[in-house]
């Protein structure tokens, strides 16, 4: 099975270490463009753009990077309750048209009650999922060319329609992640691809089976994806040393404050991430080569695959055997790690090489010359 590998745009900040300003770097448009262009050239299929008040706006970031990339797709957040589904459908169609069919959409219900209240959304967890189902039903139908009347508990529209259709037909794909029963019900009914954060394979297998069964009851099939960090090096020892360095500036007070902040979230997925490490730095390898250190201070995806290329590839294939075909990776710092993952991991996976124009001698395709006039040896076949 050919895998879809995505990268990640760190619009909330980037650096060499977690929990400190040391080694941090400014995430401006130039830096985001560097990461997007690297991902485009290296053969990543797309990039996930995060959402929330700690991030730059995902739609504006995507729109600004369309002109500086060629093949890269942009996975952008849809926020039910914060925007009208009809307006969101128009925006989605425009982004798809302007990007020449490079727009993908990620339904995000939100998990931080404080942030949601600041955005004017005062719904409980259950009510947010009710509203998200209504939003998605309208959004899909409008994008597919229907004129929609809908009288829901949370959303009412009359004569909602779209005059400029998307390029992707019947509409761009919809991604979504959530661990609660309500989230799985929504995924089974509404989305093309269900995402999970990087839990141990047995836990992921259970979630996939649940969503697959619920989708089958509705006569649907759903694809599956996973969101993971990656720390890959030439040897396993180097990879684990890099993992240790990433959290080398963390102290228990910083971890405790981060976990206290995340504890207010009503996201089941966030609770499952926190349970993997319990706020402690011992026993962070929660499954072979699956390391929970990132989640000590980072919300959302909190686990990383750690090892050399063949080892990480074996773990990726373990998830793929469960039915996952899409992997959304990231690493710190995101520019350098996009190259490491492509160079050290891709050769061991079924990933299509990036399309490149035929070289005509304007740039050297072989690496740096040796002693001015000697070509370097060709790389050994993987």
Curated annotation (Swiss-Prot):
Keywords: Flavoprotein, FMN, Monooxygenase, Oxidoreductase. Its EC number is 1.14.14.5. CDD domains: Alkanesulfonate_monoxygenase. Pfam families: Bac_luciferase. It catalyses: an alkanesulfonate + FMNH2 + O2 = an aldehyde + FMN + sulfite + H2O + 2 H(+). One of its GO terms (molecular function) is alkanesulfonate monooxygenase activity. One of its GO terms (biological process) is alkanesulfonate catabolic process. It is an enzyme of class 1 (oxidoreductase). HAMAP family: Alkanesulf_monooxygen. Belongs to the SsuD family. Catalyzes the desulfonation of aliphatic sulfonates. This is Alkanesulfonate monooxygenase. It comes from Ectopseudomonas mendocina (strain ymp). The lineage of its organism: Bacteria, Pseudomonadati, Pseudomonadota, Gammaproteobacteria, Pseudomonadales.
């Amino acid at each position: 099975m050919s895998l879809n590998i995505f990268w990640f745009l760190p619009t909330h900040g980037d650096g060499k270490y977690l929990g400190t300003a040391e080694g941090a770097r400014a995430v401006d448009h130039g830096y985001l463009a560097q990461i997007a262009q690297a991902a485009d050239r290296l053969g990543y299929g797309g990039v996930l753009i995060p959402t929330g008040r700690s991030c730059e706006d995902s739609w504006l970031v995507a729109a600004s990077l369309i002109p500086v990339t060629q093949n890269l797709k942009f996975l952008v957040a849809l926020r039910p309750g914060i925007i009208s589904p009809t307006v969101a459908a128009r925006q989605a169609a425009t982004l798809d048209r302007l990007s020449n069919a490079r727009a993908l959409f990620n339904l995000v219900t939100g998990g931080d009650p404080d942030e949601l209240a600041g955005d004017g959304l005062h719904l409980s967890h259950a009510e947010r999922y009710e509203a998200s189902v209504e939003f998605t039903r309208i959004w899909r139908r409008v994008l597919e060319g229907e004129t929609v009347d809908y009288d829901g508990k949370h959303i009412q529209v009359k004569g909602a329609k779209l005059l400029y259709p998307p390029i992707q037909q019947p509409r761009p794909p919809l991604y979504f992640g959530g661990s609660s029963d309500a989230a799985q019900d929504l995924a089974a009914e509404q989305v093309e691809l269900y995402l999970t954060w990087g839990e141990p394979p047995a836990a992921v297998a259970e979630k996939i089976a649940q969503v697959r069964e619920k989708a089958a009851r509705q006569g649907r099939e759903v694809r599956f994806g996973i969101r993971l960090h990656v720390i890959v090096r030439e040897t396993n020892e180097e990879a684990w040393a890099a993992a240790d360095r990433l959290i080398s500036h963390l102290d228990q007070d910083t971890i405790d404050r981060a976990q206290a902040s995340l504890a207010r979230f009503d996201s089941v997925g966030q609770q499952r991430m926190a349970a993997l490490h319990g706020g402690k730095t011992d026993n962070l390898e929660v499954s072979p080569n699956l390391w929970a250190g990132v989640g000590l201070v980072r919300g959302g995806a909190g686990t990383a695959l750690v090892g050399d290329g063949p080892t990480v590839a074996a773990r990726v294939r373990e998830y793929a055997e469960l039915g996952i075909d899409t992997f959304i990776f990231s690493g710190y710092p995101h520019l350098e790690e996009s190259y490491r993952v492509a160079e050290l991991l891709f050769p061991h996976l079924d990933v299509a090489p990036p399309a490149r124009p035929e070289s005509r001698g304007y740039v050297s395709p072989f690496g740096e010359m040796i002693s001015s006039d000697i070509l370097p040896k060709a790389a050994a076949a993987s």
